[in-house]
Amino acid sequence: MHQTVPPGRAYDALALGGRFRGLPAWAVAFGGGMRAVRSHAATPRYRMPVLPNVTATRYVTPLREGGSLPAIVEADDLGTYVVKFHGAGQGRKALIAEIISGELARRLGLRVPDIVTVDLDPVIGRHEPDPDVQDLLNASPGRNLGIDYLPGSLGFDPLAWTPDPGFAATVLWFDALVGNVDRSWRNPNLLVWHGDVWLIDHGASLYFHHAWASAAKLVAKPYDASDHVLATFIDDEAVTQAGRELAPQLTDDLLRALVDLVPVDWMEDEPGFDSPADVAAAYVTQLRARVADPAAWLPEVGPARPARPPAPRNASRPRWLDR
């Protein structure tokens, strides 16, 4: 993660041992504790600052794994970001979901790369030969979304590592709350970086905002965890217990503060609403209703998979050595 700290963003170092109030025990035990936590994370009321804003200075390379064609971009704060563009297929709603869900996950003690808004002049990509990239940049002038680039991070492999049950239960409960369908075995959207696991790519969550007219019907929609990458590591009781601990943290103050992080202009001209304030209120109402009745949407995950036994000490010893 880049070393510069944008103005107005104070951090408290978290020493090992979990002395940070309100941090789940697993967040300390898992990977040696969080590297940095916003200084106001433990306060009962939430006064979140506006997301930091940077200006893109260099288009580095497109990321072709995703259909929306995000890119690695350098910015004027000397940081490097994965930028998602408002001119991509899902438009600004995917960026809104990234902010609300990503920052909600952070407030639940999960690791999420820093999120910023990125001012973009399409001219920075003028030397990019791909016409699809040119079209996307030209469709995305102005404010876009940046997610801190984690250099050297690796994709999470559930076959190589058994996650802490508390961590797995928290992630699944969070994904169920926001309706995140993009945490599957095929595409975990989890990165391992410096020994910690980080959550990324929440643009497919909050799918209710694609059909506001029927959003109320989706409040109690059960979450399908059959393909969730962490479902086999926990049982129903673990997810329920995670909810008992997490739901009280999601107060009206916090939900409003999360939604207030979204740039106002991204909520303009929404069909069925008179103003961006009405759109923001609708997000809070939907999330509040979801938090209030988790029994309606919590998935059944069945019994946890037993932990893998340790490999025999000489498991990799060639047989011919024993002849």
Regions found by a protein language model. Give the residues of each.
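Extreme N-terminal basic, low-complexity initiation segments
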Residues: M1-A13
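Leucine-biased recognition of intrinsically disordered, low-complexity hydrophobic segments
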Residues: L14-L16, L23
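A cross-taxon signal for low-complexity, glycine/charged-rich
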Residues: L16-G17, G33
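Phosphate/dinucleotide-binding and metal-coordinating scaffold of catalytic cores
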Residues: R35-R323
